[in-house]
Amino acid sequence: MFYSIKELVEQAELDFQGNVAELMITTEFELTGREREEVLRLMERNLEVMKASVELGLSEKKSRSGLTGGDAAKLDHYIKKGKTLSDFTVLSAARNAIAVNEHNAKMGLVCATPTAGSAGCLPAVLTAAIQKLGLTHEQQLDFLFAAGAFGLVIANNASISGAEGGCQAEVGSASAMSAAALTLAAGGTPYQASQAIAFVIKNMLGLICDPVAGLVEVPCVKRNAMGASFAFIAADMALAGIESKIPVDEVIDAMYQVGSSLPTAFRETAEGGLAATPTGRRLQKEIFGE
């Protein structure tokens, strides 16, 4: 078992030849008593749900509230025109993140990674990485186990709850997990993966949770797209050999401190931020008649 990113990196290097996925599978057995076959089967199911949520989310159908829906399809059409400013892989990830979260807003089945509100980042980065890197099925599962390993530390030492730590804890954690797994999938070391986490979280520090009308739609859906995009930049920076001046575990500690200091208006209560704007209040009244 590991209790910090430093310990995770050391154990992966010393005991698992740098294979973070194998470390996580072993840790899962230690925590739950599940045998390897069951652990793999459950992760297979997660992978299936993630891929399906990307495909189903490309629909142009609106959510019941009318706040979201159709943006993933718009971005898909834009990508297919071949005149995008952003790299195809990164923009594909952004599209897929929007797709998953629009699917979630329409009561579709998603895999909380680590939460439903931040469920778009990891599937988006993974599916884009499959295209870019040609990941095998086994490598796709390794991607998810590795993301889970790093996410476990973040959850235990900071938070993955918007109600507790703001959106930095939800989309921030999801983006960081994705960046770490992506770094490994591209041939990086566990240490480089840890640096990718630091880059993402430092960029996300202080991000509030301010859902309009209290629904996980605005600004949540688009924040997932940005989080997926950040993951690619962070992974590239780490693979280039860039290092965080602040150790990653201290960055995670700072994330916890910042989240704990946020006023309740900025922690999923829909009482501040974008939710409290005139338009945010108007939309809430239109939806709930309040």
List the predicted regions and their residue ranges.
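Glycine- and small hydrophobic-enriched segments that form the cores of compact globular domains
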Residues: 85, 112-119, 131, 135-136, ...
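Acidic-glycine-rich active-site phosphate/pyrophosphate-binding loop
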Residues: 87-104, 139-158, 202-211, 270, ...
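Conserved phosphate/anionic-ligand binding catalytic regions in large, soluble enzymes, centered on
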Residues: 107-125, 169-174
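Alpha-helical support elements that line or immediately flank enzyme active sites
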Residues: 123-134, 182-187
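Glycine- and acidic-residue-rich phosphate-binding/metal-coordinating active-site segment common to enzymes
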Residues: 144, 150-163, 167-177, 182
